[in-house]
C-alpha cells in the first residue's frame, strides 16, 4: 500500500461534535416543554432565543426595528404613568400618599408593559436590564446600544408630554421623588439604587428564563418586584425614568447617581445569575464535561490498545521477523507504557496491568494478534480488523486484510500482467469452448491405416476419404478461410504434387478415368502470389472483381463446401452414393472432356487451418466406421481456386486376379506410410497464431 497514514478529522467536521450538539438541542426542547405551561413563558423574546448573527445582518432584519420601536413605546408609557401618578397627588400631599401612589403605579405599569412587549423585544423598559443582558451575551452590543437610546428617548417624550398636560400648580412633584431623600449623601443613594436594581434585574432574569420551573406569571413577578422596591424610599430604579423629568425640568442634582447605581447593580445581577444561579449553563457544562470525559476515556482506551498493538510487533520483530500490522519507532514501548499508566490512572484501571504490557506480559484481547511461539508458526491476523468503536482510529490496513473481502468493483490486475514477458517454452494452443477430441481423431487415423480396401475399384476413393478426414483433423472449429485461396507454401505444393504423381504411376491398370482442368500458368509460375511468410489464421477473403477469371469459383453452392455434390451433378457420375461421397465437382458450366490418354495433373491439396498437432500414440483404437457412417460426418474441405471437376469411373465387371489384389494392397500400404510421413512434415511446418497462456 502506498499510503497507510492516518488522517484526523477536525472537530467541526467530526460526527461526534454534531451528535453532541443535537443532544443539547433536544434537551433544551424537552426542558422547554416541561417548564412552558404558561403563555408568557412560551412567548419569550426573540432576542433570547434567536441564534447569534452578525451585527450587519441583524440591522437589516425587520425584527430588530420592531424591537426598538416597542422599547421606545414601553418607556414612554412607563414614565408617563409613574410620573403622572406622583404629580396627581398634589404638591401638599403627605409622603405616604405619594409613596403609595408611585409604587403601585410603577408595579402595575411594569407588569402590563411586560405582558404586552415580552414576546417582541423582551420588555426591558430599563437600560439596566439591557446592559445586564449585553454583559452576559444574550443580545448583541448594537442591539443594546439601540435599546438604551430608544428607552431614553421614550422617557424624555413621556416626561415632556406629561409636563405639557399638567396643571401649572401641580408640576412641582413631577420628578416623583421624596423630599427627604435629598438629605442623604450621594454614596448612600448610590448604594440604595445598586441594591434595589440588583433585585429587580435578578427577578427579570429568573422570570424570563425558559429553563426555570416556577409558579406564577413572569409579568406579575416583575411588577411585584418593582412595586416592592419602590416602597423603600421611592428610588428611581431606571435611568430612563430619571432622565426624562430631569431633562424637562432642567434639574441635574446628583444625576450621575441615578445612572451608575442602576447600571452597576444590573451588571452585577446578570453576572451572578449567569455563572451561579443559571441551571441551564451548569447542566450544559456538566453534560459537556461528562461527554468529554467519556470520549477522552474511549480515546485513551483505544489509543492504549493501538499503542500496545504497535508495540508488540516491534518486540517480536527483533527475533521473528517483521509484522504486517504497522511500524513504530524505538521509543514506542516506553511511551506506550508511560501513556498507559497515566491513562489507566484516569480511567480507574489497574496500572500494573498496563505497565506490564510494555514488558510483554500483556493481556490478549479480541483486536490483537497472538505472539508467534516459534519461527514455524504462521502470523495470524486479528479476528476483527475494522473500526472498533465510533471514537477510535482505524488500524493500519495491510494487503492481507484487503485480500479477505474484495469488492465486485475491485481493480483487476490486467494492467500489471500486461507488461509481463511470457515464459519460454512450447506453444500451447488455447482450449476451445468446445473440446477438440484429438485422441479420438488419432484413434480413427490408426484404424484407417489398418483398414484394407476389399475391392480395387474403391482404393483411390478410400485414399481420398483418408485425405478428407486428415483435412478435418487439421481444421479448427474457429477456422476461417484465408484471404487468398490459391496460396500455399511452395514446399507443401511440391510434396503434394509428388504424392499425386506416385499414386497415378502405381495404378496404371485401374479402370478409373480422371479429368482435371489445369490451373492458369500465371497462378503456378507467379512467385509474387505465393506466400512468403506466415499466413494468418483469421484471414478475410477478398471478393474478386467481375473481370477476374476466378469469379466462377465463387458461385459454388453451400453443399460444395463439404465436398458433396448436389442431385443435379450426380447424374454426370456413374458411381454409387459411397463413391460419390469423396468426389469433387467444379462449378464450371460445361463439364470438361474426358481423354484417357492425357495424363491428369494432381489436384491442389486442401488448405490446412489451425489445429493442435495430433498425438502420435493412442491407447485404445475405436472400431472401424463404414462408408455410410463416414458419410454422416462429412469432412469439411476448403477447395482451391484451381480445383476442377474430377469424376471417377470404375469397372465393376472386370475380373481381377488375386495377384493384382496383393500388389494393390502393398501399394496402398506404401502410400499410407508416405502420407503419414508427409503429414508429420506438414505439421512440423505449421505455425500457430496463439500466444502462450500467461501464468496467473
UniProtKB/Swiss-Prot annotation:
<feature type="region of interest" description="Disordered">
    <location>
        <begin position="650"/>
        <end position="696"/>
    </location>
</feature>
<keyword id="KW-0597">Phosphoprotein</keyword>
<feature type="topological domain" description="Cytoplasmic">
    <location>
        <begin position="274"/>
        <end position="696"/>
    </location>
</feature>
<dbReference type="GO" id="GO:0006833">
    <property type="term" value="P:water transport"/>
</dbReference>
<dbReference type="Pfam" id="PF00230">
    <property type="entry name" value="MIP"/>
</dbReference>
<feature type="topological domain" description="Extracellular">
    <location>
        <begin position="235"/>
        <end position="256"/>
    </location>
</feature>
<feature type="modified residue" description="Phosphotyrosine; by Src">
    <location>
        <position position="478"/>
    </location>
</feature>
<feature type="topological domain" description="Extracellular">
    <location>
        <begin position="168"/>
        <end position="189"/>
    </location>
</feature>
<feature type="modified residue" description="Phosphothreonine">
    <location>
        <position position="47"/>
    </location>
</feature>
<feature type="topological domain" description="Cytoplasmic">
    <location>
        <begin position="119"/>
        <end position="143"/>
    </location>
</feature>
<feature type="transmembrane region" description="Helical">
    <location>
        <begin position="190"/>
        <end position="208"/>
    </location>
</feature>
<feature type="transmembrane region" description="Helical">
    <location>
        <begin position="257"/>
        <end position="273"/>
    </location>
</feature>
<dbReference type="GO" id="GO:0015250">
    <property type="term" value="F:water channel activity"/>
</dbReference>
<keyword id="KW-0217">Developmental protein</keyword>
<keyword id="KW-0812">Transmembrane</keyword>
<dbReference type="InterPro" id="IPR022357">
    <property type="entry name" value="MIP_CS"/>
</dbReference>
<feature type="transmembrane region" description="Helical">
    <location>
        <begin position="72"/>
        <end position="93"/>
    </location>
</feature>
<keyword id="KW-0221">Differentiation</keyword>
<feature type="transmembrane region" description="Helical">
    <location>
        <begin position="144"/>
        <end position="167"/>
    </location>
</feature>
<feature type="modified residue" description="Phosphoserine">
    <location>
        <position position="300"/>
    </location>
</feature>
<dbReference type="InterPro" id="IPR000425">
    <property type="entry name" value="MIP"/>
</dbReference>
<dbReference type="GO" id="GO:0007399">
    <property type="term" value="P:nervous system development"/>
</dbReference>
<dbReference type="GO" id="GO:0030154">
    <property type="term" value="P:cell differentiation"/>
</dbReference>
<feature type="modified residue" description="Phosphotyrosine; by Src">
    <location>
        <position position="384"/>
    </location>
</feature>
<protein>
    <recommendedName>
        <fullName>Neurogenic protein big brain</fullName>
    </recommendedName>
</protein>
<keyword id="KW-0524">Neurogenesis</keyword>
<dbReference type="GO" id="GO:0016020">
    <property type="term" value="C:membrane"/>
</dbReference>
<feature type="modified residue" description="Phosphotyrosine; by Abl">
    <location>
        <position position="367"/>
    </location>
</feature>
<dbReference type="InterPro" id="IPR034294">
    <property type="entry name" value="Aquaporin_transptr"/>
</dbReference>
<feature type="compositionally biased region" description="Low complexity">
    <location>
        <begin position="462"/>
        <end position="472"/>
    </location>
</feature>
<dbReference type="InterPro" id="IPR023271">
    <property type="entry name" value="Aquaporin-like"/>
</dbReference>
<feature type="compositionally biased region" description="Low complexity">
    <location>
        <begin position="576"/>
        <end position="587"/>
    </location>
</feature>
<feature type="modified residue" description="Phosphoserine">
    <location>
        <position position="576"/>
    </location>
</feature>
<feature type="modified residue" description="Phosphoserine">
    <location>
        <position position="394"/>
    </location>
</feature>
<feature type="topological domain" description="Cytoplasmic">
    <location>
        <begin position="209"/>
        <end position="213"/>
    </location>
</feature>
<feature type="topological domain" description="Extracellular">
    <location>
        <begin position="94"/>
        <end position="97"/>
    </location>
</feature>
<keyword id="KW-0813">Transport</keyword>
<feature type="compositionally biased region" description="Basic and acidic residues">
    <location>
        <begin position="549"/>
        <end position="558"/>
    </location>
</feature>
<keyword id="KW-0406">Ion transport</keyword>
<feature type="region of interest" description="Disordered">
    <location>
        <begin position="436"/>
        <end position="634"/>
    </location>
</feature>
<feature type="transmembrane region" description="Helical">
    <location>
        <begin position="98"/>
        <end position="118"/>
    </location>
</feature>
<feature type="short sequence motif" description="NPA 1">
    <location>
        <begin position="126"/>
        <end position="128"/>
    </location>
</feature>
